[in-house]
């Protein structure tokens, strides 16, 4: 980020996914803390560079560690909704209820690139958010 050599960086922090399959809550907490630290460093660098990012996940896992019916570790992926978080200098409003296939079109739009017709997803940005001064004037 600090070098400015790249227009886009896409990374996957797999820590909570990998540890979530073990069913060990202490390991999942440590993994989540490590990811939190890493994302914090990325966001700090983005702020210094004037960049923006999306933070999301492709599925849940570590939020459900125990099968409540059996009491055994729950080691599969979940289908729980995951957040889509925008970090940057602009205020943006995103549509709720998007799908994984909507992430790439949204990212392309943020980069000023056209969405290929082969992509079935949609852009999740619905409008620029109003700041407080705009809301007061409305």
Where are these regions (language model features)?
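Feature captures the catalytic ectodomains and active-site-proximal regions of enzymes
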Residues: 1-138
């Amino acid at each position: 980020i600090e070098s400015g050599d790249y227009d886009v960086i896409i990374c996957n922090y797999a820590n909570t996914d990998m540890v979530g399959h073990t069913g060990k809550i202490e390991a999942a907490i440590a993994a989540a803390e490590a990811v939190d630290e890493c994302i914090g460093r990325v966001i700090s660098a983005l702020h210094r560079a004037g960049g923006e990012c999306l933070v999301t996940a492709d599925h849940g896992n570590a939020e459900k560690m125990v099968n409540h019916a059996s009491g055994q570790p729950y080691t599969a992926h979940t289908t729980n909704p995951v957040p889509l978080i925008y970090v940057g200098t602009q205020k943006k409003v995103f549509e709720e209820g998007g799908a994984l296939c909507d992430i790439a079109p949204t990212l392309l739009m943020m980069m000023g690139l056209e969405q290929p017709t082969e992509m079935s997803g949609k852009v999740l940005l619905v409008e620029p958010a109003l700041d407080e001064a705009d809301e007061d004037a409305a």
